[in-house]
C-alpha cells in the first residue's frame, strides 16, 4: 500500500481574468491551492492472481484577491473587484483490476473504473477544508465502467503437431 499526498500553494499569483467591454485585458491576483492525494496498492491472492487498485483525488481552488487592468507600459492599474469569480474544481478516479494468469501467456482481467461526472460540482465557498471537500466529492454522482479482457495464448507448434 502506498499513499502520496502533495499540496502546492501560490499567493498573489497573476492570472488572466477576462476583458473589459473595450477589450482591455483584466488580470486577477489570486491565491491558488492544488492538493492531490493518491492511494494505491496491490494484493496477491496467489502468485498468479492479484487485485490492484488506485484512488486519486485532485482539488484545485482559486480565490481572487483583487483585479487590475494593464496600461500601455504593462503596469497593473487597480480596478473594482469582480465578485463570484473564485473557482473550485475536483477530480476523482478509482481504478481496480482483478488479474488471473490462468495459463502461461493467458489471462483474464476484470476492471472497474469509478469517476466523478463532468457536471458535478462542490461549492468551494461552503466546503473550504480538504476533508470536507473530499466528503462532498464522494457524495456526488459518479460514473462507473466495467471491462473484461480475455487473452489466450495459442501455441501454433502444438496445433501443428496434432495434425
What do the PLM-derived regions correspond to, one by one?
Residues 1-163:
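Exposed, low-structure sequence patches enriched in small/polar residues
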Amino acid at each position: 500500500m502506498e499513499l502520496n499526498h502533495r499540496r502546492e500553494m501560490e499567493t498573489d499569483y497573476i492570472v488572466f481574468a477576462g476583458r473589459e467591454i473595450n477589450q482591455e485585458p483584466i488580470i486577477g491576483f489570486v491565491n491558488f491551492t492544488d492538493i492531490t492525494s493518491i492511494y494505491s496498492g496491490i494484493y496477491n491472492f496467489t502468485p498468479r492472481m492479484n487485485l490492484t487498485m488506485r484512488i486519486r483525488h485532485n482539488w484545485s481552488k482559486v480565490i481572487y484577491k483583487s483585479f487590475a487592468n494593464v496600461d500601455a507600459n504593462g503596469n497593473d492599474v487597480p480596478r473594482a473587484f469582480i465578485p463570484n469569480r473564485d473557482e473550485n474544481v475536483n477530480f476523482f478516479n478509482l481504478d481496480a483490476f482483478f488479474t488471473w494468469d490462468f495459463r502461461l501467456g493467458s489471462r483474464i482481467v476484470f476492471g472497474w473504473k469509478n469517476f466523478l461526472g463532468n457536471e458535478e460540482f462542490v461549492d468551494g465557498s461552503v466546503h473550504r477544508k480538504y476533508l470536507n471537500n473530499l466528503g462532498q466529492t464522494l457524495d456526488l454522482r459518479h460514473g462507473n465502467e466495467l471491462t473484461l479482457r480475455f487473452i489466450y495464448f495459442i501455441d501454433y507448434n502444438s496445433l501443428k503437431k496434432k495434425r
